[in-house]
């Protein structure tokens, strides 16, 4: 078998170390891929697949992309979940003896991509590491583009899923135990677009992980990191750090802190709630417009936009912390002139978090440094305005916001105002910063004059009128003479090249000038790059100062945004209580009111507490506004705990540890679950995980099955939630089962509300107003008419509905609820884990019932009226005796 060529041997040796990656192998001006990598890349990138002689009989499949456009191709592969290893030439091909030395300089994965063109500036690009050990989860999260690095430990899988949905990482790495734990990885991959890799066991070696962390953060014990009580969390953070060091091939000096956090510090929001409340994107279009974030986000910087998203996704549950934020928003709302001045200064500020990452990683170009400098120029006036602010949180921002004047002065003195993007082009260093640079520049510029004079002198000496001095990279400087003047060329001209219409020559004097000029250029470019690198390293050494300032700027941006939104939208400051009371006067849906023109949104009140107003049963027709009202209540509660002002006349918000929503459902065909199964799974999750401090938003429980089953389930859920020994959570419960309104008065903490409707003959007008009491009609036929159902169907539906009646069901509900209420008063109510065989359920039918059997046997056609009355009387007495 023929041997591989030396180049291909080098490729195969490198590829063997990165078998899970597509290897981008640098060859001149291209990155080439071979064999399986070429087949994959050509398919995914839709580029031509060719072949290359590799020393064997068959040519190796090959494709390639130009180096100057590599990021676009790389990003496309990474977005599809591939890892890409970048193998560069690490020595000058001119100096190489044999094959040019090459090394993998970085590995790009979905969670480690640093290309700003590929990243959304308003979102973090998180990578998460999950370790499952002894029924506990260690979770660490990092965004290497911003320097964020967190760690926590979780007791169960449900909390883990909440964290995954909260951070929405683009990549998860994990140990094999987690990968095989039965967690729904397919959902994470397909629905959330997360790439998941299981790493080898050595990544999770306890001793190695601890050593890596102590070494990176330069501490002697985990007490210095606040991690002395963490076990699997430390393993997770250490494994993640190891993975990042391997992929980035640098020191990760922008990861300056590992912050432990406790999930109990924040309101818990599961994936269903995040979707249903449309916190950061809409349910259907997956767009920001139409979400809560869209309403609140008036930030001026990328850092501020990311921080606001974190606020919305992680509401607080500490009253003091919430009020600190509200104090900041209130002062900035009142100080409108100062606020708008701050916002003007924030507008030119670039993304300092990601800029300092590029600087520390050595990938920042000269334009990045001028962007950095122009951002720093905005800091002194911002500090000047902040100094006058009174509230503690704004004063803390003032203290943290370092003006970084030394770094601003350095860049101003060292770097030209508009330098080129490419460092190899020179013209980076400002005049006067370095004497040697100025001297070499004079040589370079004077050299052009020297060349022009030499050209003129040679024309006069030789009489060759069109003689020109030119330059190319192959021959350097040369004299070009057209064939028509070839006879006038003197003897001291040495011919270098013959063209079709001209000859190219060199002279001793031109060679001397060339050496002087090109030598000066080479020295100048090398010196400029050296000085530029020194400036970059000086800035990188101050990474902690810069990151601290960036976070201060981001926080200030968020609070000025929230203050502006509060002013423009006529929001009010909510009062925060720990008594479990939610009292909203004239509340409005923050998003819907922005979508409706001319201030047409109808406001509504809400009152819930832990005693007699625990559950509000809301009835009314479809399209009347039940779902909007319930979502609005949840959003107002959430906004208050974020630290926002809220859309209401007044709001007193009791702290909620969690908000749950069960709003709408659809078949999950991929997992084989029907609408009803999806709904019941969500209900089960709520009943298992909610607490008495939770806020529940339940819409149309039980609608996916038969009327009797659905009503039974809805009723049982209301009873369960209302019982403080079982759950006792504040709840808004919308339903089409009007029969449930009979529970008011029977269950002491249940109250009825409905959406007001005005009837005009057969037509209805939705008033959108919540009023006390239950709806006595569903108005389904009228809604069908509004939807455009044909008149023939509408008229037939009216005929049928007159023949059907819900009175029997309603009276039965009332009867059973009353009996339960009486039993509870007498101390005879049954627990949920007991069975009262004597008590008939709502729709029980007894197969061997003698009354039913007698009814079946009656010959109605031969029964006289008197016999019929007597039979009816006898059967009625039997039933009365039974009850």
Regions found by a protein language model. Give the residues of each.
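Charged catalytic and DNA/RNA-contacting regions of genome-maintenance
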Residues: 1-331, 347-360, 364-456, 802, ...
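ATPase nucleotide-binding head domains, primarily ABC-like/P-loop NTPase cores
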Residues: 35-38, 230, 300-301, 308-311, ...
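C-terminal tails and terminal domains of large nucleic-acid-associated
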Residues: 841-883
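Active-site phosphate-binding and catalytic loops of NTP-dependent enzymes
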Residues: 87, 110-119, 251, 387-393, ...
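Charged, surface-exposed helical/loop "interaction arms" that form contiguous linear patches used
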Residues: 361, 365, 375-378, 431-432, ...
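Extended, charged helical/alpha-beta scaffold domains that provide interaction surfaces
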Residues: 452, 460-483, 490
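Cytosolic, long alpha-helical scaffolding segments
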Residues: 407-410, 414, 421, 477-493
């Amino acid at each position: 078998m023929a041997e591989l060529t030396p180049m291909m041997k080098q490729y195969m040796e490198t590829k063997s170390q990165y078998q899970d990656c597509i290897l981008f192998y640098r060859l001149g001006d291209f990155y080439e891929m071979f064999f399986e990598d070429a087949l994959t890349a050509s398919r995914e990138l839709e580029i031509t697949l060719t072949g290359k002689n590799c020393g064997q009989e068959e040519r190796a499949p090959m494709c390639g992309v130009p180096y100057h456009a590599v990021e676009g191709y790389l990003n496309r592969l990474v977005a599809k979940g591939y890892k890409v290893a970048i193998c560069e030439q690490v020595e000058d091909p001119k100096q190489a003896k044999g094959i040019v030395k090459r090394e993998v300089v970085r590995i790009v994965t979905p969670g480690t991509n640093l290309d700003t063109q590929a990243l959304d500036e308003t979102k973090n690009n998180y990578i998460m590491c999950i370790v499952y050990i002894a029924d506990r989860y260690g979770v660490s999260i990092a965004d290497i583009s911003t320097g964020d690095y967190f760690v926590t430990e979780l007791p169960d899988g449900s909390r883990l899923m909440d964290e995954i949905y909260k951070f929405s990482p683009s990549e998860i790495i994990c140990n094999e135990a987690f990968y095989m734990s039965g967690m729904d990885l397919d959902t994470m991959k397909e629905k959330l677009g997360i790439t998941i890799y299981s790493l080898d066991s050595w990544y999770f070696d306890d001793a190695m992980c601890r050593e890596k962390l102590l070494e990176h953060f330069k501490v002697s014990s985990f007490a210095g990191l606040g991690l002395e009580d963490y076990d699997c969390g430390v393993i997770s953070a250490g494994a993640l750090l190891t993975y990042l060091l391997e992929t980035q091939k640098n020191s990760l000096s922008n990861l300056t802190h590992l912050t432990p956090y406790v999930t109990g510090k924040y309101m818990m929001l599961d994936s269903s709630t995040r979707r249903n409340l449309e916190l950061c994107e809409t349910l259907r279009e997956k767009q920001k417009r139409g979400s809560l974030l869209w309403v609140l986000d008036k930030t001026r910087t990328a850092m501020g936009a990311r921080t606001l998203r974190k606020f919305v996704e992680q509401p607080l549950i500490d009253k003091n912390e919430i009020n600190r934020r509200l104090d900041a928003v209130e002062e900035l709302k009142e100080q409108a002139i100062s606020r708008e001045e701050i916002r003007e200064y924030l507008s030119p500020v670039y993304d300092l978090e990601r800029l300092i990452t590029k600087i520390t990683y050595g990938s920042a170009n000269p334009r990045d440094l001028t962007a950095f400098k122009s951002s720093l120029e905005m800091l002194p006036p911002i500090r000047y305005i902040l100094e006058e602010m009174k509230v503690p949180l704004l004063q803390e921002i003032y203290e943290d916001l370092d003006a970084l004047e030394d770094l601003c002065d350095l860049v101003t003195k060292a770097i030209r105002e508009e330098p080129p993007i490419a460092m190899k082009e020179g013209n980076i260093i400002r005049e006067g910063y370095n004497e040697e640079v100025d001297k070499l520049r004079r040589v370079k510029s004077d050299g052009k004059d020297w060349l022009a004079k030499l050209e003129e002198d040679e024309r006069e000496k030789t009489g060759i009128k069109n003689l020109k001095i030119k330059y190319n990279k192959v021959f350097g400087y040369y004299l070009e003479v057209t064939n028509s003047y070839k006879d006038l060329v003197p003897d001291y001209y040495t011919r270098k090249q013959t063209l079709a219409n001209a000859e190219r020559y060199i002279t001793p004097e031109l060679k001397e000038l060339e050496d002087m000029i090109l030598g000066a250029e080479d020295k100048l470019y090398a010196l400029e790059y050296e000085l530029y690198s020194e400036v970059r390293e000086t800035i990188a050494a101050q990474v902690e100062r810069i990151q601290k300032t960036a976070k201060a700027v981001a926080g200030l941006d968020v609070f000025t945004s929230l203050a502006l939104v509060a002013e423009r939208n006529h929001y009010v400051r909510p009062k925060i209580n720990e008594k479990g009371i939610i009292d909203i006067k004239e509340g409005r849906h923050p998003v819907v009111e922005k979508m409706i023109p001319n201030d047409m949104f109808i406001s509504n009140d809400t009152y819930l507490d832990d005693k007699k107003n625990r559950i509000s049963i809301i009835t009314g027709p479809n399209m009347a506004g039940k779902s909007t009202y319930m979502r609005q209540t949840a959003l107002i509660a959430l906004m208050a705990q974020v630290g926002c002002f809220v859309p209401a006349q007044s709001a007193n918000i009791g702290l909620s540890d969690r908000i749950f929503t069960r709003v709408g459902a659809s078949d999950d065909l991929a997992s084989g679950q029907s609408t009803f199964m999806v709904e019941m799974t969500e209900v089960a999750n709520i009943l298992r995980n909610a607490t008495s401090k939770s806020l529940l938003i339940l819409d149309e429980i039980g609608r996916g099955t038969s009327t009797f089953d659905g009503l039974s389930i809805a009723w049982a859920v209301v009873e369960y939630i209302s019982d403080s020994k079982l759950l006792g959570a504040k709840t808004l419960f919308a339903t089409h089962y009007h029969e449930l309104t009979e529970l008011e008065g029977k269950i002491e903490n249940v109250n009825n509300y409905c959406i007001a409707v005005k009837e005009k003959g057969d037509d209805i007008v939705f008033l959108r107003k919540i009023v006390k009491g239950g709806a006595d009609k569903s108005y389904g036929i009228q809604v069908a008419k509004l939807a455009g159902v044909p008149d023939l169907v509408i008229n037939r539906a009216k005929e049928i509905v007159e023949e059907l009646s819900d009175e029997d069901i309603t009276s039965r509900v009332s009867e059973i609820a009353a009996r339960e209420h009486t039993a509870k008063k007498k101390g005879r109510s049954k627990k949920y884990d007991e069975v009262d065989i004597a008590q008939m359920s709502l729709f029980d039918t007894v197969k061997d019932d003698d009354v039913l059997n007698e009814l079946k046997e009656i010959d109605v056609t031969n029964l006289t009226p008197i016999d019929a009355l007597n039979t009816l009387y006898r059967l009625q007495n039997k039933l009365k005796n039974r009850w």
